């Protein structure tokens, strides 16, 4: 399973660890992903999405029905 938020599209990015001597070693910054069940009142069922913390805030703001319709328009499975 890829580390991508289904709502926002956030994915891992790369950067550097910096030591006290400012040596740079490559590292990955991972999104804060969670598998979360959301109740969809219109379908009378739970839907499980892999979302970041920001994705959960987007769902709180827009509503789960709006977000699911956007996912359907993109052709993403949930």
Swiss-Prot record:
Residue ranges the record marks as coiled coil: none
Pfam families: Ribosomal_L28
GO molecular function (one): structural constituent of ribosome
Gene Ontology annotations for the cellular component aspect, listed alphabetically: cytosolic large ribosomal subunit
InterPro entries: Ribosomal_bL28 (IPR026569), Ribosomal_bL28/bL31-like_sf (IPR034704), Ribosomal_bL28_bact-type (IPR001383), Ribosomal_bL28_sf (IPR037147)
The organism's place on the tree of life at top rank: Bacteria
Record's keyword terms, sorted: Ribonucleoprotein, Ribosomal protein
Gene Ontology biological-process annotations: translation
Family indicated by similarity: Belongs to the bacterial ribosomal protein bL28 family.
Protein name listed in UniProt: Large ribosomal subunit protein bL28
């Amino acid at each position: 399973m890829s580390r991508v938020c289904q709502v926002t599209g956030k994915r891992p990015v790369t950067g550097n660890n910096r030591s006290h001597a400012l040596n740079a070693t490559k590292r990955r910054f991972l999104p804060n992903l969670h598998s979360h069940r959301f109740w969809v009142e219109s379908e009378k069922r739970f839907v499980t999405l892999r979302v970041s913390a920001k994705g959960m805030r987007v769902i709180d703001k827009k509503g789960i029905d709006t977000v699911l319709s956007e996912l359907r328009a993109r052709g993403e499975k949930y």
